[in-house]
């Protein structure tokens, strides 16, 4: 079975708690192990300054000049059935709106998130920060025909379909996407 309230969604495998103000996940607990994977906030949407770069940001290895974040959010349950439950989170930054649909299925141990961004900012970029509770993490990311593991050194790296941030015991958090091809990881914070 799966259920949702205004700020949480859960099934027999996972419980996710959403911070209404930021729209980020503040707890992501694996019910089988009791482990919480969320650090401060998983999926916090930040704004970085991009005024000094050319169109393609040649020779730039980091985009970490954080100047703001999305906020003023609201959450609402839009689906709460026996097979799937979904929470809609809406946050804003100036004229930009970021909507996320967090869904859990009754027999899945994955949290599904669909995102929709109306970004109306000049010389700025938006990044999603996945701050985990992992200690001394390493990062593995997908590349054509394989994967590669690197230290979490805050440099932008190409990544195609997925990224995995894990501790030395192999316990970690995987993020699968179909639309963005770059990320950076700094300590236990992974940014896409």
Residue ranges and their predicted role:
Residues 1-192:
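C-terminal (or distal) subdomains of carbohydrate-active enzymes
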């Amino acid at each position: 079975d799966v259920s949702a309230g205004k700020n949480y969604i859960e099934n027999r495998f996972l419980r996710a708690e959403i911070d209404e103000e930021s729209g980020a996940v503040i707890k992501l607990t694996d019910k089988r192990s009791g482990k919480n994977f969320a650090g401060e906030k998983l999926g916090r949407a930040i704004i970085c300054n991009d005024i000094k770069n050319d169109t393609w940001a040649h020779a730039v290895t980091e985009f970490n000049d954080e100047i703001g974040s999305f906020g003023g959010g609201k959450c609402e349950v839009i689906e709460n059935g026996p097979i799937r439950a979904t929470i809609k989170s809406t946050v804003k930054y100036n004229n930009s709106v970021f909507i996320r649909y967090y869904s859990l299925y009754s027999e899945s141990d994955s949290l599904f998130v669909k995102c929709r961004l109306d970004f109306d900012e000049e010389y700025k970029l938006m990044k999603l920060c996945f701050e985990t509770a992992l200690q001394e993490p390493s990062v593995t990311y997908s590349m054509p025909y394989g994967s590669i593991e690197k230290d979490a050194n805050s440099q932008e790296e190409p990544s195609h379909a997925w990224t995995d941030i894990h501790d030395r015991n192999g316990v970690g958090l995987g993020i699968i996407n179909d639309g963005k091809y770059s990320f950076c990881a700094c300590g236990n914070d992974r940014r896409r």
